Each structure stands twice: as C-alpha cells, then as structure tokens.
Amino acid sequence: VYSSKIEGEEIDLDSFIKHKKYGIEFLPDYTKKTDDLYTAYTFAKTSVLNKKNIEEAHKILSRHIVAKHLQGKIRTQNMYVSTPEGRIEYVAALPSEVQGEMEKFYHDLEILLQQELTTSEVFFFAAMIHLVFVKIHPWNDGNGRSARLIEKWFLAQKLGEKAWLL
C-alpha cells in the first residue's frame, strides 16, 4: 500500500486490508493498481530474483497502468520525470542505451546474488540496486514500483523471508 501511495494512489492501508482480508468491495479504480502490486509481491515471494521474473513482475504490477503490449517490455521512447509545474527534474537513460544498461544491471545483480555479503553490505547493495534501476528507468511506467519491489526482493533473497516485512 505504501509503495502505491508513493505513486499517488489514494487507497489507505485500512481500506486495502478490509478489501483483501474481508472481501469488502470498493470502486475498481480504488483497488486495481494496489491489487496488482500486491500480486506482484506475492509472485516475487515465491520466485527467484532474475531478469525473466523481474519482467514478469512488471507485467503483473502494470496491468492497470500501461497497455498490455508494454508490460514487461523495455521502453523505446525518451523518458523524463517532471514536476507538477512541468519542469523537468530528471532525464533517464536514452532509449538507445536502455537495453545495454539493463544487461549490465542484470549481470551485476546475478553477481551480487552469488556473493556472500554482510548484513550491512546487503542493505547497501539493495539501495544501490534501487538507485541504478530508477536511474535507467527501463519501463514506460511502473519504474518506482518495480525498483521498490526489486530492492525488497533482493533483501529477502539475501537475508531470508522476514525481510519482506521490512
């Protein structure tokens, strides 16, 4: 829920718990994106952190965000983040660079997953994974949601299941 709220979703934790636990129905637009994110986290909890599964997680979490043909696919357009006033705050990797940057990202991720790391190193690299992913901004939308999921996924793979509760 908090990952969804960062993206501007209006749903609150109490409402989402009532929706998931007790089946209380809300207007579909109120819960769809958060439901998708919940499903992506559920998928991640039972899947290995790798390229194929990250792309699948994006397909799941972006079901109600981007068109089906863009889900889990690398973007081919320029990407930037702007303020509500329209001022550009950040320009992501150029479309011609995204594929290569993601190949490096997945290669480095694979190496980190194989390394014995201290707890401090795990937290450091989890934060770096998040940062590098959002700097590349590989998807048309859902980059922040994906980065937060990948960060938590990495923590859980390295520290165990309880890391999902952080």
Regions found by a protein language model. Name each.
Residues 1-166:
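FIC/Doc superfamily catalytic core
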